[in-house]
Amino acid sequence: MNLTPREKDKLLISLAAIVARGRLERGVKLNHPEAVALISDFVVEGAREGRSVADLMQAGAHVVRAENCMEGVPEMLHSVQVEATFPDGTKLVTVHHPIR
């Protein structure tokens, strides 16, 4: 299977999000990369489903809650930027204050 670097990045984000979801289900608090992976995966999948940039920017801030993260993680994340493929092309989605 020949994958482009971008496709490899998408797969890594997806795999990291799967691991993070499993940890959340077991009650383990998320670290920085896991929180970013969950938010990023949400945005990428939402774009694939046809959701709008504005909708994903708003909804992406409600994917991970502060109580589900290790101490200090919410303060480290001021924004998450994700390049996602929408039906009309690739766009940069910025989720401001992604953990509340």
Curated annotation (Swiss-Prot):
It is found in: Cytoplasm. It catalyses: urea + 2 H2O + H(+) = hydrogencarbonate + 2 NH4(+). The lineage of its organism: Bacteria, Pseudomonadati, Pseudomonadota, Alphaproteobacteria, Rhodobacterales. GO terms for molecular function: nickel cation binding; urease activity. NCBIfam families: PRK13241.1 (NF009712), urease_gam (TIGR00193). GO terms for biological process: urea catabolic process. Disulfide bonds: none annotated. The keyword Hydrolase applies. Pfam families: Urease_gamma. Heterotrimer of UreA (gamma), UreB (beta) and UreC (alpha) subunits. Three heterotrimers associate to form the active enzyme. Pathway: Nitrogen metabolism; urea degradation; CO(2) and NH(3) from urea (urease route): step 1/1. It comes from Cereibacter sphaeroides (strain ATCC 17023 / DSM 158 / JCM 6121 / CCUG 31486 / LMG 2827 / NBRC 12203 / NCIMB 8253 / ATH 2.4.1.) (Rhodobacter sphaeroides). HAMAP family: Urease_gamma. Belongs to the urease gamma subunit family. Its EC number is 3.5.1.5. The keyword S-adenosyl-L-methionine does not apply. GO terms for cellular component: cytoplasm. Keywords: Cytoplasm, Hydrolase. This is Urease subunit gamma.
